[in-house]
A protein has these predicted regions:
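Structured alpha-helical segments in the cores of large, soluble enzyme domains
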Residues: 12-21, 110-111, 150-160
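Intrinsically disordered, low-complexity segments enriched in small/flexible residues
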Residues: 34-144, 151
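Conserved catalytic cores of soluble enzyme domains
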Residues: 1-56, 162, 170-188
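Thiamine diphosphate
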Residues: 136-188
Length: 188
């Protein structure tokens, strides 16, 4: 956070939630939220292990016996929740989603294809719950928050020469006064 939680207007002492993990995750200021220190370290190590050591490195390749051209019969039933679809197409169903609690209609993260790390950006129209049923539905429009989330991730991937895969099914742009304030900037 930038300001101390007790210095923010309307953030009264009993609340002071602007420094909390939930607030920061929903704001897009953190990539991953963990339950405890051990999980946080494991996720940090997982993320660091897939990234090139610097912007001039060629990237990280891993051994892969998963057939890139395999048939994925269940893929068609997961196209509305693209986080599930990305996991389906990735080597060994591995997907590291980032900023999962921010702009949930847009999915970003890393997958592996034929052993290579690939950035993935996709919009979703449904968020599936653990029971496999739609827990939340989204319009198939680009929002300002989703566009910023995607743009920052693509910029990050570009700075490390990580290729990006996109899965899109968009019918237009979100239209409201709030969206109009910044959507053009977010999309540029």
């Amino acid at each position: 956070f930038v300001n101390s939680p007790n210095a923010v207007d309307n953030n009264y002492t009993a609340k002071c939630n602007t420094a909390g993990a939930v607030f920061q995750a929903e704001s897009g200021n953190v990539d991953i939220v963990a339950e405890d220190d051990a999980e946080a370290l494991a996720k940090a190590r997982e993320l660091v292990s897939i990234l090139p050591s610097n912007n001039e490195d060629t990237g990280v390749l891993s051994e892969c016996e998963d057939d890139l051209n395999r048939v994925t019969a269940s893929l068609g039933s997961h196209l509305k929740d693209t986080a599930v679809a990305l996991r389906e197409i990735s080597d060994n169903n591995w997907f590291l989603e980032l900023k999962a609690d921010c702009a949930k209609e847009m999915v970003i993260g890393f997958i592996r294809l034929n052993g290579a790390v690939v950035g993935a950006v996709a919009n979703r129209s449904e968020l599936l719950g653990e029971d496999g049923k739609a827990a939340k539905k989204f319009d198939t429009v680009l929002t300002m928050a989703g566009a910023y989330k995607a743009a920052h991730f693509v910029e990050f991937c570009d700075s490390f020469s990580i290729p990006v895969l996109t899965l899109t099914s968009v019918t237009g742009f979100a239209s409201s006064v709030g969206e109009e304030r910044s959507i053009a900037r977010a999309l540029s």
